[in-house]
């Protein structure tokens, strides 16, 4: 017997990753979890321009990107009063993820997860539930 993914009330989700494969993988995983209001950006500067118009409930952000890394992007998102939840993603070690989580939290952002890539679908589903709870809190 297979279990179908439990649909979650769709959130507005902004994906930010410079890797097209990772963006596609995450978008597919989110769609499988019932998340249909997803926008993807491969450039942090473009994502900053998207924030005020799209107003995502959740931002899923890679840390290691060219031009502007995830930490700088998150600092600027915090300065622009981004009020949604954040999931940090990285291929780097756990210490880097923890440091990034601490820095982003210090900027006033709500970090609900810091995950090593690729994030397992079950973990992503749990984090989406947390983001939905934050949205209604």
Feature roles, as predicted:
Residues 17, 62:
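Active-site residues of response regulator receiver
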Residues 65:
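Receiver (REC) domain active-site loop signature in two-component systems and cognate sites
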Residues 35-42, 50, 115:
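Short hydrophobic/Thr-rich beta-strand motif most characteristic of the beta2 strand and flanking loop
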Residues 1-14, 27, 110, 120-137:
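Non-catalytic signal-transmission and effector/linker regions of two-component phosphorelay proteins
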Residues 20-39:
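Two-component/phosphorelay signaling modules centered on CheY-like receiver
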Residues 54-60, 86-87:
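Active-site beta3 strand of CheY-like receiver
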Residues 72-76, 92-114:
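Alpha4 helix (beta4-alpha4-beta5 surface) of REC/receiver domains from two-component response regulators
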Residues 42-43, 69-75:
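Acidic catalytic/metal-coordinating carboxylates
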């Amino acid at each position: 017997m297979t279990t179908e993914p439990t649909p979650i009330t769709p959130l507005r989700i902004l994906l930010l990753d410079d890797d097209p494969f990772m963006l596609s993988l995450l978008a597919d995983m989110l769609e499988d979890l019932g998340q249909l209001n997803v926008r993807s950006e491969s450039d942090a500067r473009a994502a900053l321009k998207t924030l005020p118009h799209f107003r995502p409930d959740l931002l899923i952000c890679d840390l290691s990107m060219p031009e502007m890394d995830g930490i700088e992007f998150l600092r600027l998102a915090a300065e622009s009063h981004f009020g949604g939840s954040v999931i940090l993603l990285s291929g780097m070690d756990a210490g880097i993820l923890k440091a990034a989580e601490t820095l982003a939290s210090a900027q006033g952002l709500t970090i609900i997860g810091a995950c090593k890539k690729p994030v397992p679908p079950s973990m992503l589903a749990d984090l989406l539930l947390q983001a939905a709870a934050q949205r209604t809190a």
